[in-house]
Amino acid sequence: MKQTVYIASPESQQIHVWNLNHEGALTLTQVVDVPGQVQPMVVSPDKRYLYVGVRPEFRVLAYRIAPDDGALTFAAESALPGSPTHISTDHQGQFVFVGSYNAGNVSVTRLEDGLPVGVVDVVEGLDGCHSANISPDNRTLWVPALKQDRICLFMVSDDGHLVAQDPAEVTTVEGAGPRHMVFHPNEQYAYCVNELNSSVDVWELKDPHGNIECVQTLDMMPENFSDTRWAADIHITPDGRHLYACDRTASLITVFSVSEDGSVLSKEGFQPTETQPRGFNVDHSGKYLIAAGQKSHHISVYEIVGEQGLLHEKGRYAVGQGPMWVVVNAH
C-alpha cells in the first residue's frame, strides 16, 4: 500500500504533497500553488480526486490524483454559497457537503463523474456550522452548529436535497460548541469534539431512524489546565481502538483508548505537538498520526505505539504558511 499525505496551507496558498513510507518517513513530491486560501480537503471515495475548499472567492476545486504517486492536476471548480470551513463527500461519490462557519450554512454540490457541477441545496440558520459528516450507512448527514450547541440531522435524498430527520437535532451541554466528528468502524457510535469546553461526546446510534443518545462526555484536558479551551480536530484509527483529539491553546493531542464495542472512551495520555494544531489525521494502516501546526508552519509524524495508542515522534517537516488541514490517501 502506497500512501500520500496532503497538507493545506492557506497563508501561502499551497498544498504540499508527501509520500509516506512504511517506516513513517515523509518525502516531498509536489508543491501545488492554489488560486486562493486553501483550507478543507477530502479525497473522493474512488480515490480519483482531491476536493478542496478555497476563499476569498468561495469555491470547491477538484484535483485529479495520479494513481502511481498521488500527484495533483487541476480538473474543475464550482462556486459555493459561503466560505468553506469543512468539506466531505457521501460514500458513493455523488455529492460534496460543505459546512460554512461564517455563512452559517451547509451546502450540497452535485458531482458528475467525480467533478463538481453546481450546488443543489443549501440549508441556512446553522450558526457556527463547522462540519458535515455522513453516517456510515450513507443516510444521515450530521451537521454540528457550534454556536447553537446542537448537531442537526438531515436525510440526504437521491437528488442531494437535505430533509430534516425526526428528531431533527441532538443537543450538547450549554457552551460545549460541537465542531468535528468521526464514526466508529462498527457504525454504532459517533464521537464529537467540542471546541469551547474541549470535551468529547460519545453518541450511540441506537437505530437507523435517528434514535441517538449521548452515553459519555469526557474532558480532554489535563486536570490542572486553566487556560482558554480551544479544541479543534478528532480522528480514530481504522481498527477503532484509539481516538485522538487536539487543543490549539495547549498545543496538545489527547490520546484515548476505545472499548471493544465503541461505547466507552478512556483517557490514556497527552502528546505535546506543533504550535496551535488546527488539523491532524491518522494514516490508513493505523500506525502513524500526522499533525500540523498552524503557528509553527511545520508538521510532525508520530508512530502509534502499544495498547494505549501513545504517540512517539518520528519526524518533523517544514510545510507552507499556516497549515490547517491534513489528508491521507492510500493507493
From Swiss-Prot:
Keywords: Acetylation, Carbohydrate metabolism, Glucose metabolism, Hydrolase. GO terms for molecular function: 6-phosphogluconolactonase activity. It comes from the Bacteria. Its EC number is 3.1.1.31. Signal peptide: none annotated. GO terms for biological process: glucose metabolic process; pentose-phosphate shunt, oxidative branch. Belongs to the cycloisomerase 2 family. Pathway: Carbohydrate degradation; pentose phosphate pathway; D-ribulose 5-phosphate from D-glucose 6-phosphate (oxidative stage): step 2/3. GO terms for cellular component: cytosol. InterPro entries: 6-phosphogluconolactonase_YbhE, Cycloisomerase_2, Lactonase_7-beta_prop, N2O_reductase_N, WD40/YVTN_repeat-like_dom_sf. The modification N6-acetyllysine is found at residue 287. It catalyses: 6-phospho-D-glucono-1,5-lactone + H2O = 6-phospho-D-gluconate + H(+). Catalyzes the hydrolysis of 6-phosphogluconolactone to 6-phosphogluconate. This is 6-phosphogluconolactonase.
